[in-house]
Structures are given as structure tokens and as C-alpha cells.
Amino acid sequence: MEKLLMHTLWSLAQALAELQGQPGADALRVGGVLGIELKLVKENAHVRFYENESPLRLAGGVIAGKLDIREFKAAGKAPFIIISQLGGTCIGMEELQRRIGALTPPTPPSNPVPDALITRQGRLGKVRVSLGFRWSDPDCLASITPHID
């Protein structure tokens, strides 16, 4: 079952970047703030991998199939967050340029298979974001990763 969030993709990315920058940010806190349950799916000596259990329906008809949070075990290191498997309403270049402005030139994948990502970067307000586009569907945004600077 999909979880309905009142966020737009843009406000979600900005909120996640804000959370990343706060001391003590972790997957439990992210899930609590968003009101979603995150499940530990994998762990190694350095990182815990969390994901949402069901797709997130965002404002504007956008669906985030996966919220991937990588929580580092090293003290004081901010989690890495990826909003991926974007579906529903296609977010194309026109909207991206309206929301984000100038983007870096595309970086093609080293191995162009259908699931490979073409990446670009830009700024959403004060937040630096990486944008991923599927090789098989380069006109629609497939993922967004907020970064703290």
C-alpha cells in the first residue's frame, strides 16, 4: 500500500537535506519526521541500509518507489539519502530547469544498459542535488540525491 505524503518531490529533497545536516540524524529520525516506517534491509561493518516498505505518493502525482537511507556507523557522519524509482508524473528537463536552474552537463554511464543512470547536478535552493535519468528513459527524472555541503 502506498503512503501518501503532502510533500512535493522538491520539498521532500530539501527536508531530507536539512535532516542530513542535523547532529544525530539517522534513519529512525528521518522515518519519524516523514511519518513512514523504514526497514533495515542490509548491514555491513560500516553501513546500515534502510528502505521504505511501500511507495510514497507525493503531491503532483509523483511516486517515489524507494527511499534509500545509508546510515554510517562512524560517529558524526551524516546519512546518505537517495529518493529513487520515481514514477507517476514524469519530471522532465523543462520542470527541472524551472525548479533548479542550470544543470551540469550529463555524465553518461560507463556501461549503457537500460537501468544505468545518466547523472547531472544542480542546486535546489541552497541544497546541492544529484539527478539521475535512466538510460532507457532519459527524458524523465528517475532519482534525486540531496547533498549537504
Where are these regions (language model features)?
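Short helix/turn-capping signatures at newly exposed starts of structured segments
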Residues: 1-107, 111, 137-140, 145-149
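Short, surface-exposed coil-to-beta transition loops
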Residues: 63, 67, 115, 125-130
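Short, exposed beta-strand-loop hairpins at the edges of beta-sheets
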Residues: 121-139
